[in-house]
Regions:
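A short, well-ordered alpha-helix in the C-terminal region of glycosyltransferases
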Residues: 132, 139, 146-161, 167, ...
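Short alpha-helical segment that forms part of, or immediately flanks, the ligand-binding pocket
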Residues: 72, 91-99, 113-114, 120
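C-terminal alpha-helical cap of glycosyltransferases
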Residues: 164-186
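Aromatic "clamp/platform" in nucleotide-sugar-dependent glycosyltransferases that forms part
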Residues: 86
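Short alpha-helical donor nucleotide-sugar binding micro-motif in glycosyltransferases
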Residues: 65, 73-78
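Conserved acidic donor-binding segment of nucleotide-sugar-dependent glycosyltransferases
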Residues: 118-119, 123-130, 139-145
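Short hydrophobic beta-strand element within catalytic cores of glycosyltransferases
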Residues: 103-106
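Nucleotide-activated donor-binding/catalytic signature segment of Leloir-type glycosyltransferases, i.e.
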Residues: 28, 33-65, 69
Length: 186
């Protein structure tokens, strides 16, 4: 999240009508809290707030934790979804965004490259390059055809690979059947 925050001043300057919506709680979900007793969110805000005007800051919205239904509704009305993770597991939220046909700008990191193929199912950007993040977001927001094409391809990939009834459940049952037929070792 820190690199998204660091890109905010440029994003807000480049997109004077854009609203940025940040979904999630303030606590540390993966890893520990900051050593000074604050939250990561507050540390990131403190890092960039001086570079963002009060008027622009009013276009940054923090929802906190929201229900699944509200999350899906938000995905359906958003123009772009930024997903940055530095090698960690592939998140359900990315797959949900793909399923909703969202246009995705994601970090070019190992777990993400399993489903986001640059310029096919989304745009990939260097995790550490905040200028590239802002520039790639501009590219995505400037091109409705690109957003539509990437979103449709992302949705199709999720349907092909992760559909519960056609793909996941049959594979799981096959795995359980194979385990059941394996002889037990004394």
């Amino acid at each position: 999240m820190s690199y998204v925050f660091r890109a905010l001043p440029k994003i807000l300057r480049n997109r004077p009508n854009a609203h940025i919506v940040v979904v999630g709680g303030d606590g540390a979900s993966y890893g520990g809290p900051p050593p000074d007793g604050t939250t990561w969110k507050q540390r990131f805000i403190d890092e960039v707030r001086a570079d963002i005007s009060d008027t622009d800051w009013q276009r940054v919205h923090f929802t906190g934790l929201i229900s699944y239904d509200k999350f899906i509704s938000l995905l359906q009305v958003s123009r772009a979804h930024i997903y940055l993770t530095y090698p960690f597991v592939l998140s359900w939220s990315l797959l949900e965004t793909m399923s909703a046909g969202g246009a995705i700008l994601a970090s070019d990191t190992a777990p993400v490259r399993e489903v986001i193929f640059d310029d096919e199912t989304g745009l990939l950007t260097d995790f550490f390059d905040t200028d590239a993040l802002a520039d790639n977001l501009n590219r995505l927001l400037d091109d409705a055809g690109l957003r539509s094409r990437l979103g449709a391809a992302a949705r199709q990939l999720v349907l092909d690979r992760f559909d519960l009834e056609k793909t996941c459940l049959p594979q799981q049952l096959q795995w359980v059947d194979a385990l059941a037929q394996t002889p037990a070792h004394p």
